Amino acid sequence: MTLATALLCVMAVQDPPKVNPRYEFWAECKAGSWVKVKMLIKTGQMDIETVAVTTLLEVTPEKAVVETTTTTKFGDKEMKLPAKKEEISQKPDPAQPMKPAGESEEEITVAGKQLKCRVYEFEMEQNGQKSKGKSWTTKTIPGGVAKSEFTSEKMPAPMKLEAVEWEKK
């Protein structure tokens, strides 16, 4: 599962949303707001660590435009990808493979800060592979993602994603 897919899973668990949840979290911010997330995948043979910094470039009533820079470490090797711009529509994506499995509230510590989060549990099946996850979201962090964990039949350990730094303007 890629970082983009993971973030999409985090934001697409409502049933069915009237406004794209990813847009809603960015629309609460001003241009220049950013979040740095770290994702860790254990493959059994090596750990893969991805760090992504997403910055809000523009927000309008119709869309939010963000740019993400990503660096991935495969063991001792590091690969930096070119910055990628993305337009996040205010309209929800009708192709939602998620099945909500639970929703609650929880206070967690992320980047040394206590945050009250909305917790979503979900299940999905894509390309014949079943997976499930749990995501903690908050309007305190640009983009909304505080922390997520995903498991699937083919992963030897859960994939973990967590916000490590951010600035909300």
Predicted regions and their residues:
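Sec-dependent N-terminal signal peptides
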Residues: 1-13
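Acidic, serine/threonine-rich low-complexity disordered tracts
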Residues: 15-169
